[in-house]
Swiss-Prot record:
Belongs to the class-II aminoacyl-tRNA synthetase family. SMART domains: tRNA_SAD. GO terms for molecular function: ATP binding; metal ion binding; threonine-tRNA ligase activity; tRNA binding. Its EC number is 6.1.1.3. It comes from the Bacteria. Catalyzes the attachment of threonine to tRNA(Thr) in a two-step reaction: L-threonine is first activated by ATP to form Thr-AMP and then transferred to the acceptor end of tRNA(Thr). Also edits incorrectly charged L-seryl-tRNA(Thr). Keywords: Aminoacyl-tRNA synthetase, ATP-binding, Cytoplasm, Ligase, Metal-binding, Nucleotide-binding, Protein biosynthesis, RNA-binding, tRNA-binding, Zinc. Binds 1 zinc ion per subunit. Zn(2+) binds at residues 334, 385, 511. GO terms for cellular component: cytosol. SUPFAM superfamilies: Class II aaRS ABD-related (SSF52954), Class II aaRS and biotin synthetases (SSF55681), TGS-like (SSF81271), ThrRS/AlaRS common domain (SSF55186). This is Threonine--tRNA ligase. NCBIfam families: thrS.
């Protein structure tokens, strides 16, 4: 006779097995109507699953994160239901949940068009509005296989043959005449699945293997209510306006082309942003006492075999050969930094040694995964490695954390989610070493008053790590910063120092990245600011323009003064109407426009306008220069008078 303990500690006694739905109904009809699933003894189960022993139970509704995920998963099944009605010969592969939605990989005898997607979405809505019950049946492996063989679902049969044990009991979910297989849980009724939209299609190889057949992947988004769906679609619309690829072209920052996939051709203005970002990072390296080094971008394969990268990472590495030797173009900087550390005998007095590099790295990313500046093959890491003793780890991690927040705040990123990944099952190093390392990371976060969550077992085999994920103005997550302890690489590459006891010891290595890659971070900044870069990093900070030819000499003189003051400035002396010039430079997101007419020439002043259309009136030239220098020097996010 099960006793069910609820989250508030109250208990309900039953004289027979019950389901989460039964318990919800016992509490009240309102809760029963809202019930999507249950969490029994910490495990998610369907609303209909029996509870036969004393258990803890949480009712899952659409307000819960798990509830929303279940809705999305059930919408994938709804897609399967609809597509089989429209094109009965479709073979269904897999349909998991992803961020903000779901997808289904399907094998179809024609390429889906936008008209097909519209028809599919319409049929999904028609089916969902029937509010039919979803029926779950646990069956034997053999019965499940027979079901899908009869239906010609070869991919489901393959999953059963290769991924599910013969003594397992797969869950079959019946959507009227359509049957899908899943661990679940799923919604009990399709009334929960009314707020969705199909978004796009893409190609995807079965099981991610390019030797297998290319399937069509249909992406969708799903939400608990109409308001949340509309808000998400509005965010997507705003994101499309901010797309760094579109703005990059509009502002002439960079381009990419077929002959160099995933490689950036930086134009003058984009390269100006890149170099300003480098200058900013360099200023922080100096402040936090780092050395800056530069390693070769290509090293012998033998070295990468020593590090373990060749065994674990070779598919992502570009290689070349010369004089019967094979070389790898570096995908990361760390092995090169150990080589620099190894030059000359090191003492404990030399530690900590902080080594930074703007490392030019290359990774052989799949062509289908490339995306503007966000996913490239050639990129520049703001990478650093700290060699230290075990006793120095906590202080060094502390400094890394301060540096991360210091740099992110410069760009206005305030929402940062922090996760601490702990020891995986397969690892090197003693439990004592891991205990200390994990404690050092946790204490460093606590000392900086930073809330964090643990990712148990998600650390690398060679050490625990902290991940920093920043959220932009559209609440999109970007994982950029990492502080990773490494007990393995220094040992593999024979790094050592002479300790206080006059014996050789292996240093702890801390991998530290803040921006991640400069290319990707510029993409993030472009979308965060919609191309309205803060003045200090804007490619052109000021345009000086005349109204008639009679002010040309004054404009040139003023331009020289601004250049001498360290301000990036252009003169626009074209024979165009002043309104045309202002509009053009406003569209180019130039922070300031200085207009010179006869009145300004006579008074030795300029009329100042911002790219947001604000007229700051007439100002002395010296005052303008002083204010601009202050804004640039302080790396302010605000313009004058804001």
């Amino acid at each position: 006779m099960p006793v069910i303990t609820l989250p508030d500690g109250s208990q309900r006694h039953f004289d027979h097995a019950v389901s989460p739905m039964d318990v919800a109904l016992d509490i009240g009809p309102g809760l029963a109507k809202a019930t999507i699933a249950g969490r029994v003894n910490g495990e998610l189960v369907d609303a209909c699953d029996p509870i036969e022993t004393d258990s803890t139970l949480s009712i899952i509704t659409a307000k819960d994160e798990e509830g929303l995920e279940i809705i999305r998963h059930s919408c994938a099944h709804l897609l399967g239901h609809a597509i089989k009605q429209l094109w009965p010969n479709t073979k269904m592969a897999i349909g998991p949940v992803v961020d903000n939605g779901f997808y289904y990989d399907v094998d179809l005898d024609h390429t889906l068009t936008q008209e097909d997607i519209d028809a599919l979405e319409k049929r999904m809505h028609e089916l969902a509005e029937k509010n039919y019950d979803v029926i779950k049946k646990k069956v034997s492996w053999h019965e499940a296989r027979e079901t899908f063989v009869k239906r010609g679902e070869t991919y489901k049969v393959s999953i059963l043959d290769e991924n599910i044990a013969h003594d397992d009991k797969p869950g079959l979910y019946h959507h009227e005449e359509y049957i899908d297989m899943c661990r679940g849980p799923h919604v009990p009724n399709m009334r929960f699945c009314h707020h969705f939209k199909l978004m796009k299609t893409a190609g995807a190889y079965w099981r991610g293997d390019s030797n297998n057949k290319m399937l069509q992947r249909i992406y969708g988004t799903a939400w608990a209510d109409k308001k949340a769906l509309n808000a998400y679609l509005q965010r997507l619309e705003e994101a499309a306006k901010r797309d760094h690829r579109k703005i990059g072209k509009q502002l002439d920052l960079y381009h990419m082309q077929e002959e160099a996939p995933g490689m950036v051709f930086w134009h003058n203005d984009g390269w100006t942003i890149f170099r300003e970002l480098e200058t900013f990072v360099r200023s922080k390296l100096k402040e936090y006492q780092y050395q800056e080094v530069k390693g070769p971008f290509m090293m012998d394969r033998v070295l990468w075999e020593k590090t373990g990268h060749w065994d674990n990472y070779k598919d992502a590495m570009f290689t070349t050969s010369s004089e019967n030797r094979e070389y790898c173009i570096k995908p990361m900087n760390c092995p090169g930094h150990v080589q620099i550390f190894n030059q000359g005998l090191k003492s404990y007095r030399d530690l900590p040694l902080r080594m930074a590099e703007f490392g030019s790295c290359h990774r052989n990313e799949p062509s289908g995964a490339l995306h503007g500046l966000m996913r490239v093959r050639g990129f520049t890491q703001d990478d650093a490695h700290i060699f230290c003793t075990e006793d120095q780890v906590r202080d060094e991690v502390n400094a890394c954390i301060r540096m991360v927040y210091d740099m992110y705040s410069t760009f206005g990123f305030e929402k940062i989610v922090v996760k601490l990944s702990t020891r995986p099952e397969k690892r090197i190093g003693s439990d004592e070493t891991w205990d200390r390392a994990e404690a050092d990371l946790a204490v460093a976060l606590e000392e900086n008053n930073i809330p964090f969550e643990y990712q148990l077992g998600e650390g690398a085999f060679y050490g625990p790590k902290i991940e920093f994920t920043l959220y932009d103005c559209l609440d999109r997550a970007w994982q950029c910063g990492t502080v990773q302890l490494d007990f393995s690489l220094p040992q593999r590459l024979s790094a050592s120092y002479v300790g206080e006891n006059n014996e050789r010891q292996v240093p702890v290595m801390i991998h530290r990245a803040i921006l991640g890659s400069l290319e990707r971070f510029i993409g993030i900044l472009t979308e965060e600011f919609a191309g309205f870069f803060p003045t200090w990093i804007a490619p052109v900070q000021v345009v000086v323009m005349n109204i008639t030819d009679s002010q040309a000499e004054y404009v040139n003189e003023l331009t020289r003064k601004l250049q001498n003051a360290g301000i990036r400035v252009k003169a626009d002396l074209r024979n165009e109407k002043i309104g045309f010039k202002i509009r053009e430079h406003t569209l180019r997101r130039v922070p300031y426009m200085l207009v010179c007419g006869d009145k300004e020439v006579e008074a030795g002043k300029v009329a100042v306008r911002t790219r947001r259309g604000k007229d700051l009136g007439s100002m002395d030239v010296s005052e303008v220069i002083e204010k601009l220098q202050q804004e640039i020097r302080s790396r302010s996010l605000q313009q004058l008078e804001e």
